[in-house]
Amino acid sequence: LPYTITMDPTAVLNIIYKTAVLIKKTVEDVKANQQQCKRLGERIDAINQCLKSLNDRDLKRSEIKQSLDNFRKCVQECLDFITQFKEKTSWFVRVFKNQNHKEQFQELNLQLSQCANDLNLGIN
């Protein structure tokens, strides 16, 4: 039976906000795929703006806790993915990997949309 530690929702929110700040800083330094990276950051910021309206009662609800944790994981994945574009790689490697990156950006955008929907459903 897997044992999971459920973090305090306020702590999860703080992690999300701090990771979003890191994403913003990282986006400033990316050498490739600047627009896509920036767009991911903007989508995360938009969701974070909505999260700021959550009150303590909202945060205690189990569906919100789960949705917040899923969003935290997704935001971390976005940061991990964006960070790789800080490195300067040869044009050949970038072109070769570009198709894979396109799919990864689509996947992350899809995950962000799903997180936003789940959070929205949990809030309303």
Could you describe each region identified by the protein language model?
Residues 66-90, 103-114:
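Elongated alpha-helical scaffolds
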